[in-house]
Amino acid sequence: MEEYQVHLELDRSRQQDFLYPLIFREYIYGLAYGHDLNSSILVENGGYDNKSSLLIVKRLITRMYQQNHFLFSANDSNKNPFWGYNKNLYSQIISEGFAVVVEIPLSLQLSSSLEEAEIVKSYNNLRSIHSIFPFFEDKFTYLNYVSDVRIPYPIHLEILVQTLRYWVKDAPFFHLVRLFLYEYCNWNSLITPKKSISTFSKSNPRFLLFLYNFYVYEYESIFLFLRNKSSHLRLPSFSVLFERIYFYAKIEHQHLVEVFAKDFSSTLLFFKDPFIHYVRYQGKSILASKNAPFLMNKWKYYFILLWQCHFYVWSQPGAIHITQLSEHSFDFLGYFSNVRLNASVVRSQMLENSFIIEILMKKLDTIVPIILLIRSLAKAKFCNVLGHPISKPVWSDSSDFDIIDRFLRICRNLSHYYNGSSKKKSLYRIKYILRLSCIKTLARKHKSTVRAFLKGLGSEELLEEFFTEEEEILSLIFPRVSSTLQRLYRGRIWYLDIIFINDLVNRE
């Protein structure tokens, strides 16, 4: 973010009007590749002494407009369909630089929003996806109903371009955007095919993620705009928290009330609900409320009408599920969460009389989805579908140290992520599967049985790291209080350094 401000030096009042000329600036491509490559990427041929040239970018954009889309040669099969030239050079140069340029408006807006909200100091902790669960523990125990909302995607590309026009006033820039998207996706299709989306995501993931997050940001901005324009609702301010990596967004609204049509202006007070909470990560959001499901159903159809009428995306009403927190769990960020009653008995004595008081308290349970996680491990060939560990043949060619290190890293990552679980038994089972799979892989490499391998090499102590790693970390934090250590290890621990979901956890 600081690099953008140093290089661009844009006046914020005019920053959205002149994006097209930035495509011809060499430092844009330095920002795109400077952190990954030691030398410049703007090299058309290795014989040019690795000199970067602005003329290359201008030539490439000229070729885009002059290219005949109806003439294809059989010899062009190994070339990029977008350029007709070397795909490893031209497409990477323009696509990565182009993605940096289109991120600039939201980058500067992010910086200003963080400064206005005065949350810059705590921003690093808020970037962690585990920071959502303490919010659940604090707020959701007082709520009764939860709605599981999945944001529909993809949408027509022209809708995305028209949405961008409200934020960026630059006609030449949008001509280039249209041409850029046209070459990657089927522009004439109302709903972009999954095949073209997959191709586009592999060739330019940064720009695709920008478009997706901009689309989500736009539909959530409509909620905030209508709320601020409503004179009946006097609610606290909101905050938009972007994760800097690819602009994934995470928003927590403690008191969110939205009305989606002017016809409801006379009945706003009837729909006011001060106990609505909204949390989103990537394409999945959770809407929870304390009141009756009547309002939740209203919200459900508000979402559907907004997607259909404003973004022209079809969404089935059955795709949004409304459940009761005390009876059903909701799946979010790899955990099954629900609210249950926790009964405790307190004995009180007053003079000669004693009383036994039973107290019921609501508690948020976060459970490891063991069946789904075993399914992910089976897909990755660590076990079969029943959860029985198997060897990993593709790793048997590596050294013993590399094999153990790979299994340990996977085990530590899963343990690190699921240490917030209310019940540790499922986590121990996952550790057992990975531990035994590691032993079987080593035994397969040495052409021995598991028992003979452990007896001959004495590897049991080395493999105990699968179960002792978390205890060692907590012993460093609490070196003198063993009872506190045991209590914390049995309880939930949320880490504020997790900014993405592990591939085995993410089952989307």
UniProtKB/Swiss-Prot annotation:
Family label: Belongs to the intron maturase 2 family. MatK subfamily.
UniProt subcellular location: Plastid, Chloroplast
Annotated GO CC locations: chloroplast
Function: Usually encoded in the trnK tRNA gene intron. Probably assists in splicing its own and other chloroplast group II introns.
InterPro entries: Domain_X, Maturase_MatK, Maturase_MatK_N
HAMAP family named among the record's database cross-references: MatK
Keywords: Chloroplast, mRNA processing, Plastid, RNA-binding, tRNA processing
Phylogenetic lineage: Eukaryota, Viridiplantae, Streptophyta, Embryophyta, Tracheophyta
UniProt-listed Pfam families: Intron_maturas2 (PF01348), MatK_N (PF01824)
GO MF terms, alphabetically ordered: RNA binding
Protein name: Maturase K
Any GO BP: mRNA processing
